[in-house]
């Protein structure tokens, strides 16, 4: 199985989550590439069986959370018929940011198979557990 993990990170938390996801995927026996959204390898993306795309949760708790830097996510090539996993990182309450990320990716042609926001203080625990959950759901 070929998996690509793309991330958009402002402070390094989402990059760290992407690296942990990539490590867990590799430990499960898949071929994996981890890249920032600004450095996409289009052939890798086209050949991928599964794509993880991540960013951070932006916004204030009372004013509505949303995917951070959504404009850069929209620049990812269309993901028609690609199985995609959305992930985000947050500090406090992610609200419904994962659902908003799912909608953004589905509007971009993706088939979103899972979405989760990971607490930036618990990445080492939450990221591998999320990968195990996703891989148990996905057959390619």
Residue spans of the language-model regions?
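Short hydrophobic segments within beta-strands
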Residues: 6-8, 87
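FMN-binding flavodoxin-like domain, especially the glycine-rich phosphate-binding loop
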Residues: 13-16, 22-37, 44-140
């Amino acid at each position: 199985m070929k998996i690509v993990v793309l991330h958009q990170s402002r402070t390094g938390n989402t990059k760290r989550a992407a690296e942990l996801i990539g490590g867990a995927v590799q430990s499960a026996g898949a071929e994996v590439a981890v890249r920032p959204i600004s450095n996409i390898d289009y052939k890798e993306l086209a050949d991928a069986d599964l794509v993880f795309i991540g960013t951070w949760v932006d916004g204030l708790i009372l004013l509505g959370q949303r995917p951070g830097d959504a404009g850069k996510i929209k620049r990812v090539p269309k993901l028609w018929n690609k199985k995609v996993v959305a992930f985000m990182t947050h500090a406090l309450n992610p609200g419904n940011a994962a659902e908003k990320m799912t909608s953004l990716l589905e509007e971009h042609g993706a088939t979103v198979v899972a979405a989760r926001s990971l607490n930036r203080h618990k990445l080492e625990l939450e990221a591998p557990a999320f990968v195990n959950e996703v891989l148990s759901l996905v057959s390619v």
